[in-house]
Design a protein with these regions (language model features):
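OB-fold ssDNA-binding interfaces and closely related basic DNA-contact patches used
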Residues: 1-28
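Generic intrinsically disordered, low-complexity segments enriched for polar/acidic and small residues
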Residues: 3, 13, 47, 72, ...
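Short, flexible beta-strand-to-coil junctions
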Residues: 25-32, 73-78
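Acidic, aromatic-enriched beta-alpha/helix-loop junctions
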Residues: 27-68
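Short, compact, well-ordered microdomains
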Residues: 53-102
């Protein structure tokens, strides 16, 4: 999987320490390529996350291309940015991670 000329070698699913919301980051050979989620002041279900479309303008295309989640139609503003809420397919994310780590 390539994004902006970088080979993505892993997908990490973790939690934000503040409220245990799901955090997702992508690794490349040089280290962490991007954290594609943002942690806003809202407790979410494990399979929900706001995507960082501000710093990762390509993230919704990746979610659609690899069937990793669906937009809920809900958005939340933080500062000057508005972030889309996605229902994540955690199983598909883990399967893609396993595939690209091989």
């Amino acid at each position: 999987m390539q994004i902006k000329g970088y080979d993505i070698i892993g997908i990490n699913i973790g939690k934000y320490s503040h409220n245990n919301n799901t955090a997702i980051s992508l690794d490349c050979n040089e280290g962490v390529f991007a954290t594609i989620t943002v942690n806003l002041d809202e407790n979410l279900d494990k399979d929900m996350a706001y995507l960082d479309t501000n710093n990762c303008s390509w993230v919704e295309d990746i979610m659609e291309k690899y069937c990793l989640g669906e937009p809920t139609g809900k958005y939340k503003q933080s500062g000057f940015c508005i972030y889309p809420l996605y229902k994540l397919d955690l199983k598909a994310i883990k399967e893609l991670d396993n595939k690209i780590r091989k």
